[in-house]
């Protein structure tokens, strides 16, 4: 049994110093748990902060925006509006498609939201049109969330209809089954179909109308149960040739008889194998393609999901003909991997720099090894806690660990420095470890809990920003707590066994030179400190001026929300006049795409034209531009966007909107630009009056760029004004008119062809190639009640009007969204102020409400809570320090160091040209926890000297400053060098890390210079005030 030494010191470290085996095994357990946790942690770009979002898409080919709104969107919205936990509901009704996006509260599980949505769709089914070709389809993805992978499938030998069919049945379904895949959407889908193009003249010559033909086709192609015959010994299943499966089958179909002669479909129509929707198209670079956009499920390991898809691709490609080519054009995990790898390198660099600082100051290999062990042990042990808390390895958690590198070594340095001091005085290492650790234990606890207290307010931040930084704060707090445990257990134990008087006194040329250097620095600091202590009011003036300067700089500095990252992908929207046709839009888009591909920074692109669940109107096309890797291009993404937009001006009649794809997606709708501002009214008329006025005002605002809107009410409309009296006399109903028009111009899906693998549609339309434009309406024929064929022009007049291309709702009311980018050298805060001012100057009526959306709304919430967050951090730290010191005064002295850090951080941001965004705010909050360490170390030793050695406050604080100068300088440099790699980072995702590094470095430099002088002066001031208060005579007793 080990004999306990008589020295009763050691405090909480005593047991661990005296039991080295138990201490070592405890640390090994922490290390192993961390390694296992690291291997099991998922990898992502950022913490999981997605709002539970579900998109409901309903296709109704041929329907106008007004019909889609009233017949589909409105009934669905009424049902969705009754769901609990719904945060926001936005819808867009365009020609042939209704898209409703439902965003739920952060706390609501996505599976619960899914059940609510399914129930609401079921309730609305009876209210939807009976001829709806497809039921509403919902998907558990955010439409604004960019895909993790984009595949392009092309073929030089096969038609796109066959390629699409193979992609849908052999590729898309298999990929959808991969764990982590949320949705696979097919853009440019040319789904095979039989297209029946009626010849209007032939139909009229035979005395037929389109409704008769539609009914004949529908009745001729059926697929239903027929029963079976069950005899005494055998059972026979009944089957029939009731299915027509090819264009040849339909050509021979008899649709009517005239004078005993059969009228076949081929006599009055052209029947061909074609695409179900001829107004959809996609391209990979310049080649027609079927594009697969693969989106993730919320909360999955995006790296693992992408890897699983890539692993199965070779097998999927083998199932396709050799003439079909499959390429991965976009892989967002490439930049995620690169960004995480860069942060991991910066983490290792920070560790190396911190170890270097330790050696420079301690000048002793054993003394350097001890805190160097504490750093990786604390960081690796944190991974175990991250795993159990459900966190991931992402940019923010790795940034927290990088910053923690400078924090976790502080405690070990303070312990080693104090123990070494006693060893150098001649005490035995074990006694020195017990005495030094016991003396410094309270300081370590004070430093740790006061620093963790600063992070507590981050845990209570609300909404998306709070969820975003929760992992950052908890990861950092866990690393700090583990470092405190290591510093109070392993560090003193190693000191007792690795340090000795001889090893500490042993010097080489470097250590001797550095010792002389530090002695001179401390001596010079002592002289300056005496001068400052003898002129306290000047120092107090400097301290007070830093507070005023902090407030002034906060008011002046540009403010933003989240750094714009260069992820190598640009999302583009090409907008043409509202009356543009599909073919003309496709031609314009391909011209622009060809020029984009000539840019030296562009590697590839995909483009799409048509109306689907993402693209709302025919006059807008989507582009996804993939840039070359950052190492292969000289420019960052803002410069490339500027150049591409300037290039697009050579194409008249189109406008190109570009925005970089970001890891953080808060919006719920695909937008042309980065930020959105919504107007909501009770009627479309109010919006049609005020949206153009506000748009004109904002387009003249210098703080804004690329101002546009989804308000489009200048689409051409051919209004069929039916004389109801005349129609009634002829026995023609409005239903007959609508059916005739739908049959002719709606790409109407009139029948279904069933196969073993898929289902295909029969599409009915008029062949308008011979009579384009409004003249085609003259070919419409209807059947009167007595069987006479009546031209449409007999009972109706055609009027050309303007109408909406889409109808947008927000929470069931008409809305319009104005999208914008921030111009030039302006900040998001300045842009928001400019919009608010323009709205005020325009004096909008009270029944029009306005609201920022997405990232801009989150920015306003974050900005409004910044001061409260900082105040909460200060109050939390004051409470912790007050409890630890049992004093109201000493915490104030410690907190007096904070303005110096604020000044340094804000000045550094302004000098670097950075905005005060949420990343920088986190840096400032961390500085609050760091810079007070200097004051704690000074005040702890000053109070101990007053209490134990009977020193005066002046002598006590002077001695404390000199004794703690070296560990203060060492810990500050360690924290500074831990943040330096973040400030100097240039790789992928550097934009995210840069503000944090700039804040930390700037704040630490400024606070280190000032607090070494202001803290002792303020300590003496408050000590004097406290003594004067205690010396006041007691109140005399009343007689």
Swiss-Prot record:
Keywords: Cell inner membrane, Cell membrane, Membrane, Transmembrane, Transmembrane helix, Transport. It is found in: Cell inner membrane. GO terms for cellular component: plasma membrane. It is a multi-pass membrane protein. GO terms for molecular function: xenobiotic transmembrane transporter activity. The chain crosses the membrane at residues 16-36, 342-362, 373-393, 396-416, 440-460, 472-492, 537-557, 863-883, 888-908, 911-931, 968-988, 1002-1022. HAMAP family: MdtB. Part of a tripartite efflux system composed of MdtA, MdtB and MdtC. MdtB forms a heteromultimer with MdtC. Belongs to the resistance-nodulation-cell division (RND) (TC 2.A.6) family. MdtB subfamily. This is Multidrug resistance protein MdtB. It comes from Serratia proteamaculans (strain 568).
